[in-house]
From Swiss-Prot:
The keyword Cell membrane does not apply. Catalyzes the isomerization between 2-isopropylmalate and 3-isopropylmalate, via the formation of 2-isopropylmaleate. It holds the Pfam family Aconitase_C. Pathway: Amino-acid biosynthesis; L-leucine biosynthesis; L-leucine from 3-methyl-2-oxobutanoate: step 2/4. This is 3-isopropylmalate dehydratase small subunit. It comes from the Bacteria. Belongs to the LeuD family. LeuD type 1 subfamily. Its EC number is 4.2.1.33. It catalyses: (2R,3S)-3-isopropylmalate = (2S)-2-isopropylmalate. Keywords: Amino-acid biosynthesis, Branched-chain amino acid biosynthesis, Leucine biosynthesis, Lyase.
Length: 199
């Protein structure tokens, strides 16, 4: 997972609330366990509407999604995060996230920052005044800036640290590789052990 500090990219004013994971990626697309190839599945039903915001030219190549409250509710689907990342999003800002979606996001390198509903309105207004405008999201400062509008967002310290360091679950484990090896070497040989996977 790459380190996350600052993202500069097109922002989307996603004026929808209560967006569940089935709306983010319908269950019919959950047949694979790879992390890529899901960009076409993102918001699949809504993208059939030519007027849907992600179909508008100004928002092509967007990396920042400013959503309404209660984003990512419903079932736990890592695929929802994979679809957002595969489409190109690095950041989702919302007044409220489902806890399990937020947890899945941080582990996959998607920043989910909590903003107030008032700040969401301010960001939406700035984006809609200049469709295609670039947003700057600074994880170090915990700020999002669109034009003259700058807001602060909240993110838990642990997830913020993992994103700044670029640590997914495997990389986090590998930080302790020496200690793990020392433990395994000192452990009695007669005890059960896990054999390495041969690829």
């Amino acid at each position: 997972m790459e380190k996350f500090e600052t993202v500069n990219g097109v922002a989307v004013p996603f004026r929808r609330s209560n967006v569940d994971t089935d709306q983010i990626i319908p269950a019919v697309f959950l047949k694979r366990v790879t992390k890529t190839g899901f960009d076409d599945a993102l918001f699949h039903a809504w993208r059939q509407d030519p007027g849907f915001i992600l179909n508008q030219e100004a928002y092509q190549g967007a990396t920042v999604l400013i959503a309404g409250p209660d984003f990512g509710t419903g079932s736990s689907r890592e695929h929802a995060v994979w679809a957002l990342r595969d489409y190109g999003f690095r950041v989702v800002l919302s007044p409220r996230f489902a806890d399990i979606f937020r947890g899945n996001s941080g582990k996959q390198g998607l920043l989910t920052g909590v903003i107030s509903e008032e700040d969401a309105e301010r960001l939406w207004g700035a984006i809609e005044a200049q469709p295609g405008i670039t947003a700057t999201v600074d994880l170090v400062a915990k700020t999002a800036t669109v034009g003259e509008v700058q807001v602060s967002f909240d993110i838990d310290h642990y997830t913020r640290w993992r994103l700044l360091e670029g640590l997914d679950d495997i990389a986090l484990t590998l930080r302790d590789e020496v200690r793990i090896s020392e433990y395994e070497a000192a452990r009695a040989r007669w005890r059960p052990k896990t054999l390495p996977v041969k690829l």
